[in-house]
C-alpha cells in the first residue's frame, strides 16, 4: 500500500523520521492549546483490521465474540483518556486503482492456496506468518464499531483521501493507520497502528517534515516524489528507466542504504537540484519522460491535493481549470450540514479549482463550488478514467442511499445505484474442492434479485435492465474484466413494491411488505410462515441455511446439525470459554463451509438494507450467530455421528430448539424438492449434480 519502497526506506535509512509519542500526553497538550475542543483521531480502519484481530484462531471463519471484545477494549482505552475516534472504511475502488486492486486479489489467491495446502498436509492452522483476515471482517467491523457507539463513515472514494481531508479540515490530533500515502498528504500528523501499544498508548509518529529534511525536499514536492517512485495510481514500472538514470548520476550513494533506498535518495536529489530549477517555468512533461502517461501522472500528483491546496508543480494559469477525478465529501453525520469547503453531493458533480495545469489534462480538482448535481459530460482523462453513470434517477432515493452508505448503514446498495459496479475481495475458499462452489456463485442469484429491486428490473426471468459489473474473486477468474450480471425477476405476492415504499413509507403493513421482499430475494416466499414462527435471532440464520442447502446440493444432514448446534451453543457462552476451545484438527471442508455461512451473513446485510430493514441488523451479526472454532468443533463431532443431545452439550432447551430449527429448514427445503440426507447415504466422494463453471455465469 502507498508509495513503493518508502516504508522500508524510512525504517532503515531515516529512523529519526519516526518518533515515539504518547496519545494521552498528546491529547492533554491538544486540550491546553484548544480549550473546549475534543482531541480527535481519524482512523483508517482498513489499515487496522490486522491489528484489531487478536484471536489466535483465524482460519475457521472468525472468532467474532473475541474480536468484538478486542474492538470494545480498543475504543474504551482511547475514550478513557478523552480522545474521540472517527473511523473511515473504504466504500469503493477508484478506477485508477483497479489494476492495483486486481494485482492484490490475485496475490491473495496464491496465499490462500498455500493456506489450504498447509491445512491438508498438517491438519492444523498455519502460523501467524500466513495470517489471512477472516472473510467479511471489514464489513462487520463497521457494524461492530457502530454498536459500540462510534462514529463510523464509509468513503465515496478512496478512503485515504477522505481520511487525510477530514484530518486536514477538522484540526485533528492525527491519523492512525499504516499507509505511506499519509506521509505524502499535507495533513495532520500520522501515527502507526502497527507500533501502537494499547497498554501504554505509546506509538510511533512518522514526521513528514523530517522526511523532507532528509531528502532535501519541500512538503509540496512529496506528491511528485510519490508518483515517480510508484504508488497505487502510477505503476512502479512506469518510471523504472528514469529512476535508473537518476541513480547512475547520483554522486552520494550511501553504503548504509540498499538499492531501493539509494533510488529514493537519487530521485529526491533530481527533484531538488534539477527539476526545481525550472519549477513554474516548464510543464512537467517538458522536464520528465511522461510520454503517453502524462494525464495519468498529473492525475496521480493532483490526487494528493486536499481541499484548497495547490501544487507549485502545476504552472499557474488563472484561465485554466483543472478537473480532478475526485470529489470532496461531507464528513459530517448530518448530510445537510454546511462546511467551510463546499461539498459534492453526487459522483456526477464536477469540482473546479484554478490550480491551472494545461487544460488538455482536464484532471479533477479536489473542491467543488456548490452542492448541486451537474449533469454535464465528464472530460476523458485517458483509458484509466471512467465516468460513473448514475443508474437510479430518483434523486430522493439516491440521496437516502448515499446517506446510508456514508454512515456505514448499508453494504453495496449505493454502489449498485450510483455506478452499477460492485466488488468483493478474497474469501478463504479451496480452489481444488470441486464439490463446494465459491460464495460468489452461491449468492449471485440473491444479488441479481437485489439488482432488480434497486434498478427496476423487468419480468421474464432474466431482466433486460442494466447489467451490474461484478468484480468478485473466485477460482479461475483472472479479473481482467468484471462479470456483467443482469437483474433477475422478483416473485413477490402482490407485486414488487417501489423503493420509496420500502425505504420511506410509514404505512401500516409496510414492515410485512419489507419482509416479503427480503424473502423473495432469497426465493423463499413459500416458506414465509415457517420462518416467521422462528424466534430471534434464528430467523435470519434459518433463512440463510434454507437458501444454502437448496443452492448447494453437496451439503448434508451432518452439516446442518453442525450449523444449528453451534448457533445454539453460542448463546450465553462466555468469550473466554470460546477462546480456550481446543480442536482435534482442522478440516479444510469445514473452513470453506464457515466461509459460505459468513459470506451469507454479508449478503443478508445487502438484502436487508435494500428491502428497508425488515430485520434488525443485530439479528445477523456474526458475534450473535457464529463462532469459527465452535462451528469447527460441532462439524467434527457431527461427522463422527454424535447425537443432537451431545452436539448441544446436553442442554435440554437447546435440544428442543435444535429439533425445531432443523424441522423448519428441512420442511422449507422439501418445498423446493431438496431433501437433506445424511452423508452415510451418499456414495463415496459425492460431488453433487450442480455445475458452477465460471463461463455459465459470464453469459449473464
Swiss-Prot record:
Task: Indicate yes or no for the key word Nucleus.
Answer: yes
Biological process terms from the Gene Ontology for this record are: fat cell differentiation; peroxisome proliferator activated receptor signaling pathway
Q: Can you list the GO cellular component terms from the UniProt entry?
A: nucleus
Q: Which UniProt keywords apply?
A: Activator, Differentiation, Nucleus, Transcription, Transcription regulation
Kindly report the protein's main subcellular placement as a broad class: nucleus
Q: CDD domains attached here?
A: PIN_FAM120B-like (cd18672)
Q: Where in the cell is it found?
A: Nucleus
Describe the subunit structure: Interacts with ESR1 and RXRA. Interacts with PPARG; in a ligand-independent manner.
Please give the function described in this protein's UniProt entry. Functions as a transactivator of PPARG and ESR1. Functions in adipogenesis through PPARG activation.
Q: Which family does it belong to?
A: Belongs to the constitutive coactivator of PPAR-gamma family.
The name this protein carries in UniProt is Constitutive coactivator of peroxisome proliferator-activated receptor gamma
What lineage, starting at the top, does this entry show? Eukaryota, Metazoa, Chordata, Craniata, Vertebrata
| Gene for this chain | FAM120B
